[in-house]
Amino acid sequence: MSDINLPLSFSDAAATRVKMLIAEEENPALKLRVYITGGGCSGFQYGFTFDESVNEGDTTIENSGVTLVVDPMSLQYLIGGVVDYTEGLEGSRFFVNNPNATTTCGCGASFSV
C-alpha cells in the first residue's frame, strides 16, 4: 500500500482475511466489493460481497495479491476511508473507518454524512 494517492485504503488485516476466504472458495477470480446502500439507523449502510467482475468506472485497490472493488457512486462516500477487518468479543467483521461519516450507529454498520 505504498501508493498514497489512492482514494480509499485496504488494510493488511482485511487483505489477509479476503485472501483466506478466496482460498476457501477455490476461486482466485473473486474480489471484495464494498458498496453503500440507503438504510440502517443512520441513513446509509456498508455492504460487502465477493464479485468476479470489475465494471466500467469501478475503482480497484490491491493489497497482498487481492483486489478491493468500489463503484463510483459508493466511492464518493468512502474517499479517505480504510476498509479493515477485526476479530473480537463481538465477532469478526469487515468495516470501514470513514472520515466522511458525521454520525455512525452503535455497531458501525451505518452512517450519515
UniProtKB/Swiss-Prot annotation:
SUPFAM superfamilies: HesB-like domain (SSF89360). NCBIfam families: iron-sulfur cluster assembly accessory protein, PRK13623.1. One of its GO terms (cellular component) is cytosol. Gene3D superfamilies: HesB-like domain. GO terms for molecular function: 2 iron, 2 sulfur cluster binding; 4 iron, 4 sulfur cluster binding; iron ion binding. It comes from Vibrio vulnificus (strain YJ016). Required for insertion of 4Fe-4S clusters for at least IspG. Homodimer. Its cofactor is iron-sulfur cluster. Binds 1 iron-sulfur cluster per subunit. Pfam families: Fe-S_biosyn. InterPro entries: FeS_biogenesis, FeS_cluster_insertion, FeS_cluster_insertion_CS, FeS_cluster_insertion_RrpA, HesB-like_dom_sf. Belongs to the HesB/IscA family. Iron-sulfur cluster binds at residues 41, 105, 107. Signal peptide: none annotated. GO terms for biological process: iron-sulfur cluster assembly. This is Iron-sulfur cluster insertion protein ErpA. Keywords: Iron, Iron-sulfur, Metal-binding.
